[in-house]
Structures are given as C-alpha cells and as structure tokens.
Amino acid sequence: SSLEERRAARAARRRKQDENEGGEEQEETTSRRSRRRQQEDEEDSYSAPAEPAYDAEAENRRRQQQEEEEAAARAAEEEYNRQQEELRRQRQEEERQRREEEQRRQQEEEERLRLEREEQEREEEARRMAEEQKKKKKKGLGGLSPEKKKMLKKLIMQKAAEDLANEAKAKAEAKEKYINDLVPKFSTDGKDVAALQALCKDFHKRLASLEEDVYDWEAKIRKQDFEINELTLKVNDTKGKFVKPVLRKVNKTESKLDKIQRKEAKKSDFRDNLKSSREHEADKEGGEGENE
C-alpha cells in the first residue's frame, strides 16, 4: 500500500542520512533522529485511517475514468457504424444510378437501331419503287402484264419469307443441337455431396474449355479483320487513291431478293430468246416460200 511505500522511502532516506553524518555528532543526532522518528511514526499513525478514504476516492476516479473511456469507445463505435451505413447507402445509390444509366443507354441504343431499321426500310421501299418504275418504262419485259408482275413479286416475297423462316429455324435447331452435344443430360437425384462436387468440377472444366475456344475464335476473327483491312489498304495504295471503308449493315433479305430477281431475269431472257428464235425461223420459212 501507499503507507508502506512511504515508510520504506523514509527508511531509505534515514539510512542515507546516517551514512553522510559524521562520528562526533553521532550521539546528538541519534537522539534528534529518534525524536524525529517517533514524531513521524505518530504522524503516520494519525494519517493511517485516512488511507481508505484516499483509496475510495481513487477508485471512484478510476471507475469514472473507465466509464468515460467506455462511453467514448461506444461513441466511436456508433460513429464508425454510422459511417459504414452512410457508405453502404452511398454505394447503393451509385449502383442504382449506374443501373439507370445503363438502362437509359440501352433504350437509346434500341431507339437508334429502330430508327436505322425504319430508315433502311424506307430506302429499300424507295429503291423498289424506283426499280418498278424503271421496269414499267421498258416494253415487252417477259411479256407479263402489270397484274402478273405484281403477283409474281408477291409470290417471290412469300417464298423469300418462307426461306428466311426455314433458315432461322434450321439455325436455331443447329444451335440447340450443338448446345445439347456440349452439355449432356444429367440428373442430381440420389447423388451425395461428393458426386455433386465432381459434377460441378466437370461442368467447370467444360466451361473453361469453352471459354478458351471463345477466346481463340475471337482472336482469329480479329486477326482476319486486321488482314482484310491491310489488304484493303494495299489495294487502295495500288489504285493510287484512298477510299475510307464504309461500315454498313448488310440486309440479308435484300441480297436474297436480288438473287431471286436475277434468276427470274435469266428465265425471262431465255423465254425472250426462245420467242425471238421462233419468229426468226418463221420469217426464214416465209422468205423461202416466196422464193419458190
């Protein structure tokens, strides 16, 4: 306790004083020292009952300090939790804004594509009308009346639409067959955890292999595009002029309709040639009869 510490300190001071004092004054100082010791012991005996009060006050201060520290720790923890909650709300708000921005960009892209499709359809319609006007100006085109031409064009369009639908269906079936071949049928009924883990690992390996294939094909396509651009630049250099490549969407329906129209044109040319050859033979026979 503090009382014992004070007594030990006084004893140490007394020993030090005893060592420093001289031999002649030893008796006189001994008597003075004894009286001083008795006085200090009496003071210690009087001050000893006040020690518990001092200890209780120190304990109260220590407890109060501890409570203040705990309150400060709780306040710091609440502040930290509040900051974390604020950060979480801020991240949620940023995520919501990001989703709204992505949705807005997607809607704008869809609107742009829709407008492009409508513009392309209008251009195709204008080009088709121009071609029809040109064909109307020509005489004897296949020997067909305007009604028959319109019916033939309608049939061609129907056939083209059927071909496109069949092609899309065939592509979808081929895609589904390819996916079914890559991912065989499986069942999880009656399997334990080890079997399910092995199944998941097998699917993960398949997925990694397919990702590698996708990466390889994308690299090949990029390489081919680069080679095509390089060859285009070389061709333009040999021509002595540079033509900026125009990237536009290719309408498969238009190309197929052009192909069908070319076939029909060939058939009509064959009929015209056949008709003209018959007329030529008839004229020739008529000329021989007159000569006879």
From Swiss-Prot:
The keyword Acetylation applies. Residues 46-55 have a biased composition (Low complexity). Residues 1-149, 255-292 are annotated as: Disordered. GO terms for cellular component: troponin complex. Transmembrane segments: none annotated. Keywords: Acetylation, Actin-binding, Muscle protein. GO terms for molecular function: actin binding. Residues 58-134 have a biased composition (Basic and acidic residues). The modification N-acetylserine is found at residue 1. Residues 237-250 are annotated as: Actin-binding. GO terms for biological process: muscle contraction. The keyword Acetylation applies. Belongs to the troponin I family. Troponin I is the inhibitory subunit of troponin, the thin filament regulatory complex which confers calcium-sensitivity to striated muscle actomyosin ATPase activity. This is Troponin I. It comes from Chlamys nipponensis akazara. The lineage of its organism: Eukaryota, Metazoa, Spiralia, Lophotrochozoa, Mollusca.
